[in-house]
Amino acid sequence: MASAQTGTEMSPHHVTRTYKHENFLSFISTMSEKETVETTQEPKQVVEPTQELEELAIDGDQAAAKKKKSKKKKKKAVSLDKTYADGVFPEGQWMEYPLEVNSYRTTDEEKRYLDRQQNNHWQDFRKGAEVHRRVRQKAQQQIKPGMTMLEIADLIENSIRTYTGNDHTLKQGIGFPTGLSLNHVAAHYTPNSNDKVVLKYEDVMKVDIGVHVNGHIVDSAFTLTFDDKYDNLLTAVREATYTGVKEAGIDVRLNDIGAAVQEVMESYEVELDGKTYPVKCIRNLNGHNIGDYVIHSGKTVPIVANGDMTKMEEGETFAIETFGTTGKGYVIPQGECSHYALNQDIDGVKLPSERAKSLVKSIKDNFGTLPWCRRYLERAGEDKYLLALNQLVRAGVVEDYPPLVDTSGSYTAQYEHTILLHPHKKEVVSKGDDY
């Protein structure tokens, strides 16, 4: 989920653009080798032609029967607690820290011991990440042009509920509203219940999915297109995100990550309908660190050089996300709001009405400080809540997050991973075979 930053515009760092760019995927992507299966043949028996034909016919009937049977045995999605009954979930991709001063961490027994003490904490993230991988695989297979945004959101969110095996949102489940931002809309759009938008073949959709287990949030996103003319835009953003992941680590300055991301992102161009566009970083969107039940926990990870000398620290969790655009490279809030979150410091704030009080109680009971959308309120049984909700926003009790948009007619893309800064190595916990 994107972190937006307000302030003065910054001139993009000038970088020579090239069409051939070193693929940073080689630093972090685990490529699975193709398996080769050797077959051995039994010595062929000599049979009469009529017997051979009869045996082939029998074999064919049996194969057809097996095929028919296998179609009926389609696997049904179940809670991962049944799949991983021992509570040990797949680890993410491990990476060394980039700085030489951190090289000792890999072999330091004390650091590894401290890491083991937080094993339950890490298992929550790994479970959330495995849910995320399965949900996005299903989404990538099933999302097609012609589907409504509501159908797509339901597909993703119901899959999260199935794989976590729990509809109690505070224990585990959806980490934040499913982002389905289209084209020039970069972030913070999910359909409200009256939404009629239909996905089109020419759309560029950012799919931003959050899964949490006991408040430990996995935040990861990809961009879905059906027309390959956008490939260079997607490649630029994906490689920029990989660069951010590679550069991140304990004691790394946030500015240095932003500078590296910008250099990669802005070395790309994309040709759309005969016109060439430079790919720009959206300079006021950032990655962020993640706290327990808090998606944006204070630090922001820039995607351009911005002079921030703040360092990443041991034990922190970060969402490394980058946004590229064919537009201005700067987003503004615009459009009907769907994303909200309860502010953490509301003790002593006078609530404006009895309806507002009951709505705050419902929000606390169902979401705590996790972000939510209007559809989730309705699922929790709330109706006729809009007036009270707007009162809470004006009172500063609830924060609203409207859609963030670049220039109309432009195209934006996003990729994102969650990383865990262990004492000895970093873990790209959301890494999968897809990205």
Swiss-Prot record:
Q: Which PROSITE patterns match?
A: MAP_2
Catalytic activity, as annotated = Release of N-terminal amino acids, preferentially methionine, from peptides and arylamides
Positions annotated to bind substrate = 188, 296
- GO MF annotations, alphabetized: initiator methionyl aminopeptidase activity; metal ion binding; metalloaminopeptidase activity
Instruction: List every stretch annotated Disordered.
Output: 57-77
- Any GO BP annotation: proteolysis
Which coarse location class describes where this protein primarily resides? cytoplasm
Supply the alphabetized keyword list.
Aminopeptidase, Cytoplasm, Hydrolase, Metal-binding, Protease
- Which residues make up the binding site for a divalent metal cation 1? 208, 219, 416
Locate the compositionally biased regions of type Basic residues: 65-77
Q: Where in the cell is it found?
A: Cytoplasm
Q: Which residues bind a divalent metal cation 2?
A: 219, 288, 321, 416
Cofactor binding: number and manner: Binds 2 divalent metal cations per subunit. Has a high-affinity and a low affinity metal-binding site. The true nature of the physiological cofactor is under debate. The enzyme is active with cobalt, zinc, manganese or divalent iron ions. Most likely, methionine aminopeptidases function as mononuclear Fe(2+)-metalloproteases under physiological conditions, and the catalytically relevant metal-binding site has been assigned to the histidine-containing high-affinity site.
Q: Name one Pfam family in it.
A: Peptidase_M24
Q: Which family does it belong to?
A: Belongs to the peptidase M24A family. Methionine aminopeptidase eukaryotic type 2 subfamily.
Q: What does this protein do?
A: Cotranslationally removes the N-terminal methionine from nascent proteins. The N-terminal methionine is often cleaved when the second residue in the primary sequence is small and uncharged (Met-Ala-, Cys, Gly, Pro, Ser, Thr, or Val).
In its UniProt entry, what is this protein called? Methionine aminopeptidase 2
